[in-house]
Structure formats: C-alpha cells, structure tokens
Amino acid sequence: MKRGGLWLLLGLLVLSACSSNPPAASTQEAPLLGLEAPEAIPGRYIVVYKENADVLPALEALKAALEPGLMQPQGLQAQALRTLGLEGARVDKVYTAALRGVAVEVPDQELARLRQDPRVAYIEADQEVRAFAVQSPATWGLDRIDQRTLPLDGRYTYTATGAGVHAYVVDTGILLSHQEFTGRIGKGYDAITPGGSAQDCNGHGTHVAGTIGGTTYGVAKGVTLHPVRVLDCNGSGSNSSVIAGLDWVTQNHVKPAVINMSLGGGASTALDTAVMNAINAGVTVVVAAGNDNRDACFYSPARVTAAITVGATTSTDYRASFSNYGRCLDLFAPGQSITSAWYTSSTATNTISGTSMATPHVTGAAALYLQWYPTATPSQVASALLYYATPNVVKNAGRYSPNLLLYTPF
C-alpha cells in the first residue's frame, strides 16, 4: 500500500515536471569548465542548472527514481530524463540541495547538445579527490618520480596504490612467498614448465615485480601482481615462450590491466603482433628499450609503436650508459642501481641496473592511473603518462629520444 502511494507520488511529480518538452536549443553554449584539470575524469561531468530554471520537480523525481532498491513504475525514470534533456546520458548522481544538477557520463556529441540547453548554467569535468600518503625514507627511484627537479628529498608521495588493478609480469616468474607481495599475488602462467607455478628461480622477475608493486620498493603498493613465466632460471627464453605468455594474458586478463615486459631481443614481427593484439584487447603494455646503447627501433618489442617503451636514467638524470635510445622510446625512468625484492628468500633484496628496472617504474605509474581511471584505454594511459612526464631534464638523452622523465602525480 505504501509502495503504491510512493509510485503515485513519483508519477505525479514526473507528470508535473514533464508537462512541456525541453526548451529549444540556445545559440549560446554553456561554459565547459575543468576539462584540462590534471584530475579530470574522462567522459564524466557535473551538469549544473541555472537557479531560475524550472527543473527542481524533475530532479526530485529522478533522484527518487534512482534510489537503490526502490521499485518504480516503468517509464518514470525515462520521462524525467527526457524532461531534463538527459536521454543520452548515464546519470550517476542527482543534486537538489547543495546545487541543482546531475553527475553524468556522456559521449562528446551528447555533451555538445547539453551545452546548448538554455537551462544549463555550466558543465564541469568531474575530478578525483584523494587522501595523501608518504613513504619516508624512499629508494632513489621512487623518490625521483614524484618530484620535478633534483635534489632528491628522501620521500615518495603518492595518492593512489594501484588497488584493483592487475599487473602481469612477463618475465622469469615471481617468488610467490616474498613478503613484499603478501596477499596480492594473482593467477599466473608458466610457459617454461608446463603446469608450473611460475615460481622465480632467477630473480629478475621478482625484482621487477617489487618495483611495480612491492610494499616497500613498489610504485603501486596495492596492485595485484600476476607472474607470467616466459624466461628460465638463466633469464633466457624464446619468442615462442614470450608469445605464449602474451597469448595467455590476452585471453585471461582481468581489467584494468597492464603488462610489464622487461625483456626483448632482435626485431620480430610475430612478437610485435602478439604485443599489438594484447593492446587491442585493452591491456596497456610497457616494454624495456634494451641495454645495448643503440637505437631501440632495432629491437622487439621495444619498436612497437602502441606500447610504452622505456629508457633508463641515473640518479643524476643522465641517460644510463647502457640504455637504448631514439624515436621508438616514449620516456625515461630510473634504471641504475635500483633496489628491490629478490628471489633467494622471502625478505631478500638486490640492487641491479637496466632498462628492465626502469620499465616497472612506468608500469607502476600506469597502475596508479588505472586505479583512478579504470576504463582508460591503453592509448589514454600512455597519453597521460607522457602528458605528466617532466620535460628536458634528461642529460645526453640520445639522438631523436624524447626528453621526458617519468613523473607520478597520481
């Protein structure tokens, strides 16, 4: 009986609010604010109506119709959306007190139409609000990526942890019992030992995983790490094993997802194609530039345009002497004398160098970004990392290299 009364009230509200069609489009567009803000959420906006706009009854009806668990008469929500000119939007929140408006997800075409509604005062890009955490003291690599300039301040400041994001470490496996990863090891794959657990017997993959998401040494301290073992105990393997690992990830990944490939070899069309297909499946792929002090465009998967290719720097912002360079790079990250987890015990650490060590810094940063923007495409993730990177600080970056150093405001 009470439910029926509520339905009747909703119906009356909507019928009253919908007594006329939305007004004709205005020749003057409503302002669009905050689109360039660092924390802007792609595709999400707050639509604020003018104080004198006759929209409150429709907003109240829509707010009631969206109440969780409330059964509503068919068509009431659609009718309220039509009255407010929101047929093409997905409404997430409705405001009737602090302001009169809605939070919506809309495509660009619908956004343009909303801006022409004369009842709209302005539209603002939705943004993230975050708590802050600081690690002090921090390893130099973490310390470097959260500040624009030297000297280092001994701190790593971060606003996200990568929680809810899945990082696939295509490498030598991971020491599953290491305390850096407690409770955050996800399902893995072993291309070296059929049916194996992807346990690391080399150390390289554990070190990489520690930089991506270790509790002490990691960029993204809450990310879920998936071991994908494609290299043996000597750190060697084949393109066929690497492609097998990529094939498994492409088929079985959980989004939001990022792949780390701190490995490579000579140019390979098959490997490049496997990487591209993983990217086309919606997985961001971060790859090492290589350690031969040569043009990265001669190496796979470093030469894959849609992947994020990473060179290495020293603690003084020089390109590391071993790091590959050139047009196929996207950015640089710390890669010399990096301390992280190791495979010899559950508490072991090691300090090593390479573009393999630079790459997981970027993978961790991608995980931070994906925590806040879980539906971001690989292209959007790459664009964000390049947008925030610090320009023109890498010394001797190498011919045709982009002079960009990883920076993490996330």
Swiss-Prot record:
Q: What positions does the domain Peptidase S8 occupy?
A: 139-410
Gene3D superfamilies for this protein: Peptidase S8 propeptide/proteinase inhibitor I9, Peptidase S8/S53 domain
Q: Which residues form the Inhibitor I9 domain?
A: 45-130
Q: Name one GO biological process term.
A: proteolysis
Q: What is the annotated localization of this protein?
A: Secreted
How does it get modified post-translation? Contains 4 Cys residues that form two disulfide bonds.
- Family that this chain belongs to: Belongs to the peptidase S8 family.
Name of the protein: Extracellular serine proteinase
> Which organism does this sequence originate in?
Thermus sp. (strain Rt41A)
